[in-house]
Amino acid sequence: MAKEKPILNVAFIGHVDAGKSTTVGRLLLDGGAIDPQLIVRLRKEAEEKGKAGFEFAYVMDGLKEERERGVTIDVAHKKFPTAKYEVTIVDCPGHRDFIKNMITGASQADAAVLVVNVDDAKSGIQPQTREHVFLSRTLGITQLAVAINKMDTVNFSEADYNEMKKMLGDQLLKMVGFNPDNIDFIPVASLLGDNVFKKSENTPWYNGPTLAQVIDGFQPPEKPTTLPLRLPIQDVYSITGVGTVPVGRVETGIIKPGDKVVFEPAGAVGEIKTVEMHHEQLPSAEPGDNIGFNVRGVGKKDIKRGDVLGHTTNPPTVAADFTAQIVVLQHPSVMTVGYTPVFHAHTAQIACTFMELQKKLNPATGEVLEENPDFLKAGDAAIVKLMPTKPLVMESVKEIPQLGRFAIRDMGMTVAAGMAIQVTAKNK
């Protein structure tokens, strides 16, 4: 059997009307990931509903409700092969109220493709586009390509393409720390397929790569094997004849039998006896591996979901308090000092109190708008100081980004998301 191609996760971001789903549908179709018969059927369905031209987007919008509304809601995962990779597409929604998905979606991505409508050069960059690019950057995405879409609506005009390219570079990408000179801007017409997988004859003035070729040129993610071991516990089983078997996904570092380990904040110390994945014993496990492991010296009652495993020589950080950069996504009123919602960080769910509102930021650029604001409302970005009400493992995103991100939930919805930029460790 040939060695499997490495997987590359690519987030598709941008304003809802830029044609993201159509671009993704076209990549899947021309990449051979969709049965052409399905497209014929969907085309008929789209025409009957008076939405001719939406058939590729239908591929991504599996949900019936989404079909009728013409809006992508959940993060949809689809795969297609390129020469080098098995590409998994994370199709991030475009509307404001779906930024939460954007945050969870983008944080799984190795690279992003920003899809924009060439016509936006006349009306200006959409606020949602700014927010998506800023969030992607905040979430650690460093590889970006830009698909300037709907080129067919401007007769494949090179002047319009150049105007859009310059505007994005000057008014957005440079501001958030991307260098436009290192970014490919591909003129595409996703509905027709121009420059998506196949080189277009309509853009003789463009000598660059197609979108699929640009995706193929992204660098594969490096597994964070050199970072300290961090493994958030999902469940703990007690197996007769074996003992305590915690399970979870290795986020960073390497785990192997014989390792001396500690679970925080539980404080339980033990030694790894065996590591298993899919019922097979492994000599070691690395980031991305979902494993079960047996620990000598630790009982089922000593540890629980939300604890994080690390080596005794470099234990996980239990936060006394932490400073974070957050984006408020939705909130019926305002957030003030003393507000104590539930934080979802790795596998833990712990209430944390807002101790200080230090700075209010422009969500599109990160610049400081106000020092020590009285409150935060939906749409605000901010730097805040937080204190967990119970022991919680949190790492600074500068040191171990995989354990520095969180979502904040209250009243049955995600009200904010963010990342820890500084953590004060609890004294033992």
Swiss-Prot record:
GTP binds at residues 14-21, 91-95, 149-152. Pfam families: GTP-eEF1A_C (PF22594), GTP_EFTU (PF00009), GTP_EFTU_D2 (PF03144), GTP_EFTU_D4 (PF14578). Residues 70-74 are annotated as: G2. Residues 5-225 form the tr-type G domain. Residues 189-191 are annotated as: G5. The keyword Metal-binding applies. InterPro entries: EFTu-like_2 (IPR004161), EFTU-type (IPR029459), G_TR_CS (IPR031157), GTP-eEF1A_C (IPR054696), P-loop_NTPase (IPR027417), Small_GTP-bd (IPR005225), T_Tr_GTP-bd_dom (IPR000795), TRAFAC_GTPase_members (IPR050100). It catalyses: GTP + H2O = GDP + phosphate + H(+). GTP hydrolase that promotes the GTP-dependent binding of aminoacyl-tRNA to the A-site of ribosomes during protein biosynthesis. Belongs to the TRAFAC class translation factor GTPase superfamily. Classic translation factor GTPase family. EF-Tu/EF-1A subfamily. This is Elongation factor 1-alpha. It comes from Methanococcus maripaludis (strain DSM 14266 / JCM 13030 / NBRC 101832 / S2 / LL).
